Amino acid sequence: MTNSLRVAVLGGGSFGTAIANIIAANGHHTYLWMRDEDRAEKCQFERENPEYLPGYKLNDNLEITSDLVASVADADVVTLSVPSQSFREVARRVAPHIPENAIVLSTTKGIEGESFLLMSQILEQELGNVRIGVLSGPNFAKEIIQNQFTGSVIASEHDSVIQCIQQVFASKTFRIYANTDRYGVELGGALKNIYAIVTGMAAALGCGSNTQAMLLTRSLAEMTRLATALGANGMTFLGLAGVGDLILTCTSDLSRNYRVGYAIGKGESLAQVLDNIGQVAEGVNTVKIVKDKADEMGIYMPLVTGLHEVLFEGKDILEVVTGLMTGAMASDVDMQGGVQ
């Protein structure tokens, strides 16, 4: 590959737009695909994505299009940044058109419902024998496009993928770390969305710093417990894609999932909240999926269970909190295996 690569970013939401803008600013031939033709033409003409990132000028080198085939033609890197619910459909549509030697990257943080597959596993099914990577970490799109100092993780079993993605994305304000635990990095990004809803609820109820610290720590314990049972490396959850992403998402109202939790904590219904927020909050779907998997595997996840009771079983938040606080008290840390 030469220094200047051809990169396609599929998905014109906030994160897809932000990373496409970085790549274009780095001097690569960058194409941002949006599903809606009118939106794509408007963003291309106005040099702004007013629906998701209003007020931020897009790099002049960024080409915005609704032509999926043209966007990936001769691409060195194809990045999928679409919601998890439409991920497989987009992967299947684009599969025949991805160049043979292209690297395919997922930035989507979610889990497919019935299969419990992560996005890179869907890519393996739909695309066959391609080099795959996952980009994940504590990354708000708004701060990326503002050129705030940001760190992220590229995870792949292929050194060539890691090196290429670092070359494509890295800038003076965007630092890319490496990890070979693709499954763990991706699982961390999906699971933390659940706990952002929990901490948002706690904030709405007026809980203080003691509560926040307890929730963050116990959330990390639950994430790690499930992830290691599924085969991930527990050490991954001590890095940017684990505890880093958890802290960011659980402490800021820039997080859609945190805002969902906050609104529910203030008494709004789930349907009302999702309608008002106007964007996908992956954590809501992930709660159901993870609850079912934890029950199936016999994994102790009391925060997931409690949140499921509030969101989908009609239980009162304070009743659930009381149950969590008065339940059996386990050890804080297993000295052989980490946080319990």
From Swiss-Prot:
One of its GO terms (cellular component) is cytosol. It is found in: Cytoplasm. Its EC number is 1.1.1.94. Keywords: Cytoplasm, Lipid biosynthesis, Lipid metabolism, NAD, NADP, Nucleotide-binding, Oxidoreductase, Phospholipid biosynthesis, Phospholipid metabolism. GO terms for biological process: carbohydrate metabolic process; glycerol-3-phosphate biosynthetic process; glycerol-3-phosphate catabolic process; glycerophospholipid biosynthetic process. Gene3D superfamilies: N-(1-d-carboxylethyl)-l-norvaline Dehydrogenase, domain 2, NAD(P)-binding Rossmann-like Domain. It is an enzyme of class 1 (oxidoreductase). NCBIfam families: PRK00094.1-2 (NF000940), PRK00094.1-4 (NF000942), PRK00094.2-4 (NF000946). Belongs to the NAD-dependent glycerol-3-phosphate dehydrogenase family. HAMAP family: NAD_Glyc3P_dehydrog. This is Glycerol-3-phosphate dehydrogenase [NAD(P)+].
